């Protein structure tokens, strides 16, 4: 029997009606079976569908990270990605996808910058809308997030974002506005932070903007543990508190109702919205059990997506593509055999598979001799034990070790790392429990092995019953596990290759830890990461890498950051590569600069002090399952690179506009750069960047006609004009070029950015082919937020349309006019 909302509301008890307004557990809404109200499942994350388990999860497709997706500048491709996301949700039994993330990476240091799309709100909104449209075409609801201002991780639950109304509207709300207009997703997730003194989840002004001004009526849900009050959040418009069991609704709502602090009509309105969400979501044909769908066509899409996201930053003397006739190639770097497929936090998942660059090069060059050297490790924590681990199992108890214990649950393990935030077992006390992880560790090299144990909770490591690491009483807070974990505590032991040793971790859950922290999210459960590595001689590793590079015909040096450096829960403290990486790159370039290509994997910019010496630099982001294939396809010319930077790439962290106003100080952060975010700032102050917004090279060449032709000379918001230019592929291979339309208001009496992106198109051309490319402006192209009037304003006057292949490479110009000044609100 179908869900009938009016029938449910007329027959439901007050208790059940209030119960609808919060989740029943970590991922599900509250069901009412007797009224045919099913439970709806939500799931992370931004680059793949994890399902209901952080711990021992079902494998999934891992897509490239958000900045990689935006680097394609391809809305049609992102619609396909959205469809794949929707299908993965259906396979995991999930009705609602918690994504995408469209916060603004105002600083390169943001921990979740890799999850977001772009520093430009138009690009971020357009790409997100395409992805959402694809996802919701499968019946799965998208919950776009985080509304609004969750642009840093430091004290994200407590920080007060102080931002002008103009910057809030033009930069931070604009992506949500575009998504509301172009996609209208069924759900919206609020942010953890405050905006100008009020938590967004409690701000009637902010939530009314969505529903009243924008005429968009999604289910509004909290971020996980991002509800802080009963009365204010209910009256502001928050429909659903997540996760469950509820902390601020239930009996507290009943009490507030009796005190007339919440109206009956408000409860009815929130319950109706939840039921509308349930009604829409329950139509999705979800799987009854969580499963995978690792299909060939999905692999092909993921590989194409990865390759098309890659940005060719530098190609001096056309070092790329490399010839496939190479007799000897050196593969150097931490990421050659261990690719960074995603960032950390909500983006984490268990992938179906991972293709390394080593594997991909071996496939592409089957007759080439490969010299492989790590050169320098890039890990922040010692690598988790998996390949050398057998017979691993984890036992759960309510009692600590050394007491009489009753076994409550058992879980086979494939590696020595786990997160237990959503782990449940019958009779296990979620508030306080203990676990013992045992397994057989067989090292492949003799020598001194270093062990590192990081915990959210407490932990002891034993090797053959000898205590090697104690991470219990003297704990120091680190950045792992959403910012709740300790730093890595280290110990060492001499081991023999081929001999099997008994590994044992005695673990206590989160509440056994004495550490406390402000502003971070306490998801509960706990977590641990045990890593191990042969104690290495760093100088000898570099010498071996240099020797390989000197001997080889060409060298690919692949390194960068990973999920330990970029993750939800903390921000980066600097923009540098991990310790020792720059020295490795410099040493290799000293002997092989003319035959070395540098491949960087990171979700946001890193410093490149060696950039002027490198002939080839490739930005490969976090590329998902097909990372190795995508990189190799570009490097050897099977794919002509067409990616464009969605972020400006500063020379130094001190140059970025948020440098003096980043992180929470005294409980607040001042957005002092105002509307001058990213390229808007660098251009306004004349600050040189290493690579500009929109930059990306190709293996072919293009010409663009110098004059922009308009479909109409007068700009009318109700029917914006189209700008057109001719573009020709003048090279020898097929290639795609992204034409970017920037609008400038050079005569405006109001201080404005030099130019702003308001349209783009990606054009694929065969060698010698010429085409007219059309770019449609949107309604917002000439507008800014007038803080006095509290409305959008389009000033009368002459405007410039600038079309180029980056924010700094403008190839065509034209002018148009606005015939009269207009004010407006809404979408």
UniProtKB/Swiss-Prot annotation:
The catalytic activity of this protein is classed by the Enzyme Commission as 3.2.1.21
Which residue spans adopt a coiled-coil conformation according to this UniProt entry?
none
Q: Which residues form the active site?
A: 223
Q: Could you tell me which SUPFAM superfamilies the record lists for this protein?
A: (Trans)glycosidases, Anthrax protective antigen, Beta-D-glucan exohydrolase, C-terminal domain
Which reactions fall under this protein's catalytic activity? Answer: Hydrolysis of terminal, non-reducing beta-D-glucosyl residues with release of beta-D-glucose
Q: Which residues cross the membrane?
A: none
Query: Record's Pfam families?
Result: Fn3-like, Glyco_hydro_3, Glyco_hydro_3_C, PA14
Q: Which GO terms describe its cellular component?
A: extracellular region
Q: Which PROSITE patterns does its entry note?
A: PA14
Q: Which residues form the PA14 domain?
A: 387-546
Query: Where found, per UniProt?
Result: Secreted
Q: Which GO terms describe its molecular function?
A: beta-glucosidase activity
GO annotation, biological process: cellulose catabolic process
Known glycosylation sites? 471, 594, 600, 625
Pathway terms, separated by semicolons:
Glycan metabolism; cellulose degradation
Keywords assigned = Carbohydrate metabolism, Cellulose degradation, Glycoprotein, Glycosidase, Hydrolase, Polysaccharide degradation, Secreted
* InterPro entries in alphabetical order: Cellulose_deg_GH3 (IPR050288), Fn3-like (IPR026891), Glyco_hydro_3_C (IPR002772), Glyco_hydro_3_C_sf (IPR036881), Glyco_hydro_3_N (IPR001764), Glyco_hydro_3_N_sf (IPR036962), Glycoside_hydrolase_SF (IPR017853), Ig-like_fold (IPR013783)
Function of the molecule: Beta-glucosidases are one of a number of cellulolytic enzymes involved in the degradation of cellulosic biomass. Catalyzes the last step releasing glucose from the inhibitory cellobiose.
Q: Which family does it belong to?
A: Belongs to the glycosyl hydrolase 3 family.
Q: Supply the name of the protein.
A: Probable beta-glucosidase H
Q: Write down the species.
A: Aspergillus oryzae (strain ATCC 42149 / RIB 40) (Yellow koji mold)
The major lineage groups are:
Eukaryota, Fungi, Dikarya, Ascomycota, Pezizomycotina
């Amino acid at each position: 029997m179908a869900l009938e909302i009016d029938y449910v509301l007329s027959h439901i008890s007050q208790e059940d009606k209030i119960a609808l307004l919060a989740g029943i557990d970590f991922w599900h809404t509250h069901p009412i079976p007797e009224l045919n109200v099913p439970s709806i499942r939500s799931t992370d994350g931004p680059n793949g569908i994890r399902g209901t388990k952080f711990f021992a999860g079902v494998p999934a497709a891992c897509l490239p990270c958000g900045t990689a997706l935006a680097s394609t500048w391809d809305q049609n491709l992102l619609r396909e990605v959205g469809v794949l996301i929707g299908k993965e949700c259906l396979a995991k039994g999930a009705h609602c996808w918690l994504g995408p993330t469209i916060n603004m990476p105002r600083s390169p240091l943001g921990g979740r910058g890799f999850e977001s799309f772009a520093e430009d709100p138009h690009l971020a909104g357009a790409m997100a809308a395409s992805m959402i449209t694809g996802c919701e075409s499968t019946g799965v609801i998208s919950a776009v997030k985080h509304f609004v201002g969750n642009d840093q991780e430091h004290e994200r639950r407590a920080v007060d974002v102080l931002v002008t109304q103009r910057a809030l509207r033009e930069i931070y709300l604009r992506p949500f506005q575009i998504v509301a207009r172009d996609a209208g997703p069924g759900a919206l997730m609020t942010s953890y932070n405050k905006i100008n003194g009020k938590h967004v989840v409690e701000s009637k002004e902010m939530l009314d903007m969505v529903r009243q001004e924008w005429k968009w009526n999604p289910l509004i849900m909290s971020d996980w543990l991002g509800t802080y009050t009963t009365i204010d959040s209910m009256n502001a418009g928050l429909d659903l508190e997540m996760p469950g069991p509820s902390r601020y609704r239930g009996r507290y709502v009943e009490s507030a109702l009796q005190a007339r602090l919440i109206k009956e009509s408000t409860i009815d309105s929130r319950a109706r919205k939840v039921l509308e969400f349930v009604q829409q979501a329950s139509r999705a044909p979800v799987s009854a059990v969580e499963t995978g769908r690792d299909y060939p066509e999905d692999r092909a899409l993921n590989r194409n997506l990865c390759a098309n996201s890659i940005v060719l930053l530098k190609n001096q003397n056309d070092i790329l593509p490399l010839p496939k006739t190479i007799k000897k190639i050196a593969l150097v770097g931490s990421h050659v055999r261990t690719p960074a497929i995603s960032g950390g936090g909500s983006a984490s998942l268990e992938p179906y598979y991972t293709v390394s660059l080593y594997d991909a090069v071996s496939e592409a060059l089957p007759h080439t001799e490969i010299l492989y050297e790590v050169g320098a490790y890039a890990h922040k924590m010692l690598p988790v034990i998996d390949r050398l681990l057998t017979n691993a199992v984890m036992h759960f108890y309510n009692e600590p070790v050394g007491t009489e214990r009753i076994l409550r649950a058992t879980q086979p393990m494939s590696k020595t790392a786990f997160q237990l935030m959503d782990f449940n077992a019958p009779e296990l006390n979620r508030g306080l429990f203990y676990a013992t992880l045992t397994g057989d560790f067989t090292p492949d090299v003799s020598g001194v092995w270093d062990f590192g144990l990081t915990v959210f909770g407490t932990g002891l490591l034993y090797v053959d019953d000898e205590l090697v690491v104690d991470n219990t009483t003297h704990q120091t807070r680190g950045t792992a596990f959403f910012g709740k974990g300790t730093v890595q505590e280290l110990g060492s032991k001499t081991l023999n290759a081929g001999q099997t040793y008994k590994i044992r971790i005695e673990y206590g859950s989160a509440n056994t830890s004495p550490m406390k922290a402000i502003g971070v999210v306490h998801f509960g459960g706990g977590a641990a990461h045990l890593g191990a590595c042969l104690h290495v001689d760093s100088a000898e590793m570099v010498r071996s890498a240099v020797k390989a590079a000197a001997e080889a015909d060409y060298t690919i040096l692949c390194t960068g950051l990973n999920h330990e450096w970029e993750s939800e829960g903390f921000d980066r403290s600097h923009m540098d590569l991990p310790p020792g990486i720059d020295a490795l790159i410099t040493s290799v370039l000293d002997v092989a600069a003319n035959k070395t290509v540098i491949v960087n994997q990171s979700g946001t910019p890193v410093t490149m002090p060696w950039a002027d010496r490198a002939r080839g630099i490739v930005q490969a982001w976090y590329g998902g399952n097909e990372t190795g294939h995508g990189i190799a396809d570009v490097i050897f010319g099977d794919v002509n690179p067409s990616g464009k930077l969605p972020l400006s790439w500063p020379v130094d962290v001190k140059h970025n506009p948020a440098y003096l106003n980043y992180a929470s100080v005294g409980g607040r952060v001042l957005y002092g750069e105002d509307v001058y975010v990213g390229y808007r700032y660098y251009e306004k102050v004349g600050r040189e960047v290493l690579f500009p917004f929109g930059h990306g090279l190709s293996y072919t060449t293009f010409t663009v006609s110098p004059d922009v032709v308009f479909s109409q000379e007068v700009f009318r918001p109700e029917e914006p004009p189209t700008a057109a230019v001719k573009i020709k592929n003048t090279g020898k291979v097929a290639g795609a070029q992204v034409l970017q339309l920037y609008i400038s208001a050079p005569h405006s009496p109001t201080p404005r950015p030099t130019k702003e992106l308001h349209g783009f198109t990606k054009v694929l051309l065969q060698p010698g082919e010429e085409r007219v490319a059309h770019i449609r402006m949107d309604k917002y192209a000439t507008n800014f937020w007038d803080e006095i009037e509290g409305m959008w304003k389009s000033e009368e006057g002459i405007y410039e349309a600038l079309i180029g292949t980056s924010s700094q490479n403008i190839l065509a110009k034209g002018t148009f006019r606005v015939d009269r000044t207009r004010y407006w609100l809404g979408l």
